[in-house]
Amino acid sequence: MGKKRINEVSTTEGAPAEKKKKVEKWLNTSSEDGEGTKKKKRPWRNKVRKLAAKKAAAERRVENSEESTILEPVATAEEATKKKKKRGPKKKKYKPEAAEVEKKNEEGDTVKENPIAEAKKRLDAGRFRMLNEKLYTCTGSEAFDFFKEDRTAFDLYHRGFADQVKKWPNHPLREIIRWLQAKPDKQAVFDLGCGEAKIAEAVGEKHTIRSFDLVAVNDRVESCDMSKLPAEDGSADVVIFCLSLMGTNLYDFIKEARRVLRTGGVLKIGEVTSRFVSIKQFCEAINKMGFETTNRRQLTDYFMMFDFRKIDKVEQKRPYGLKLKPCLYKKR
């Protein structure tokens, strides 16, 4: 009956406005009666059902657990050992002391190293860089006082320096030793900043060698500040600075070297090439302090060697140009 009436209404095109209003009113009333309408959702019912389901599931779990504790038989000793066998042996815990790292030495052979020892090496290398920076950025007297209080720091520095030297393709010290070996006459040689006194070890029988450094690492070394040498005026034929012009008071070192040298004596300097701001200005500055340049040459791409002869005339005590950049190692 409802469909018939809808069809009749749809065919009445062009009907007057009053008739249309009646039709719309009838359609609204029919929709209210329930034809073609959806039921309203009741979300609170679903919530209640979910809570009830959860509660029931929890109760079932409690019941099941109680039953299992009552009915489960106790395992015998034999069954327990069988279970252990099935599990297999326990994995050994990782012990860093026992672990070893394979590395290649200088000969190319694989060498096993303990990671703890490796970590200690890295710490020592870091402290060496710190000490190295300190030596290049303080005066000689400050460095002397520092190492006097902490002898272990000096030992650590020299170990680190020895490790660095192993990586160098050449060392100016070898050139100086060859030069001294070629000297026919016996010379009084002062090795300033000597380290382990390698010059005294190599040519000590041929020449009279006095080795000076901030700390005496062996019997051949005299401990002192290089700007205050325990020696008389004009007592040396040769004064050597091999990679040892490290303090900020370079003028004091050169002045002291001139004091202990006899007139005509040789001041020999071996230094890293990259430290020089200007090689020409460096030589001119030393010449003004009472020397003349007799030899200047580059040993390799890394090192320079200078020979100066002491003369009587001193033009300036603190000339311009006597400057060296600090030789700092890159941080890793």
Curated annotation (Swiss-Prot):
Record's compositionally biased regions (Basic and acidic residues): 95-109
One GO BP annotation of this record: rDNA heterochromatin formation
Comp. bias regions, Basic residues: 38-53, 82-94
Database matches in Pfam families: Methyltransf_8 (PF05148)
SUPFAM superfamilies documented for this protein: S-adenosyl-L-methionine-dependent methyltransferases (SSF53335)
Region Disordered, residue ranges: 1-109
Origin superkingdom: Eukaryota
EC number assigned by the record: 2.1.1.-
Keyword entries, A-Z: Chromatin regulator, Methyltransferase, Nucleus, Repressor, rRNA processing, S-adenosyl-L-methionine, Transcription, Transcription regulation, Transferase
InterPro entries membership: RRP8 (IPR007823), RRP8_N (IPR042036), SAM-dependent_MTases_sf (IPR029063)
Gene Ontology CC terms: chromatin silencing complex; nucleolus; rDNA heterochromatin
Binding site for S-adenosyl-L-methionine: 158, 193, 213, 225-226, 242
Enzyme category, top tier: transferase
GO MF annotation, one: methylated histone binding
Subcellular location: Nucleus, Nucleolus
Keyword rRNA processing tagged: yes
Disulfide bond entries: none
Job of this protein: Probable methyltransferase required to silence rDNA.
Recorded family membership: Belongs to the methyltransferase superfamily. RRP8 family.
Name under which the protein is recorded: Ribosomal RNA-processing protein 8
Protein's organism: Caenorhabditis briggsae
Lineage: Eukaryota, Metazoa, Ecdysozoa, Nematoda, Chromadorea
Gene name for this UniProt entry: rrp-8
